[in-house]
Amino acid sequence: MVTIRLARGGAKKRPFYQIVVTDSRNARDGRFIERIGFFNPIATGQAEGLRLDLDRIEHWVGQGATVSERVSALIKDAKKAA
């Protein structure tokens, strides 16, 4: 099953997440189909905290992809801010 979820990157104690489309059987930070955004939970100042390609998200959801709880909350925040 295809899912849209977070893949962790960054350094120890400084997380940075890619929002990716992947097969649910793949490892959390493993192979993915497409990168559709990022989330920086510790963004400060002028740093961008969240970027999403909403068109691609709608495309993948239309193809039957499931969205993780955290990513769905981020999508909701992005739509509210736009």
Swiss-Prot record:
Residue ranges that the Swiss-Prot or TrEMBL entry lists as coiled coil: none
One GO MF term attached to the UniProt entry: structural constituent of ribosome
Please give a single GO biological process term from the UniProt record: translation
Q: Which PANTHER family match?
A: 30S RIBOSOMAL PROTEIN S16, SMALL RIBOSOMAL SUBUNIT PROTEIN BS16M
Q: What are its GO cellular component terms?
A: cytoplasm; small ribosomal subunit
Give the originating organism.
Sodalis glossinidius (strain morsitans)
Lyase: present as a keyword of the record? no
InterPro entries given in the database record: Ribosomal_bS16, Ribosomal_bS16_CS, Ribosomal_bS16_dom_sf
Sorted alphabetically, the keyword list is: Ribonucleoprotein, Ribosomal protein
Report the family membership.
Belongs to the bacterial ribosomal protein bS16 family.
Pfam families given for it? Ribosomal_S16
Which domain of life does this protein belong to? Bacteria
Recorded hits in HAMAP family, A to Z, give: Ribosomal_bS16
Q: What is this protein called?
A: Small ribosomal subunit protein bS16
UniProt-listed SUPFAM superfamilies: Ribosomal protein S16
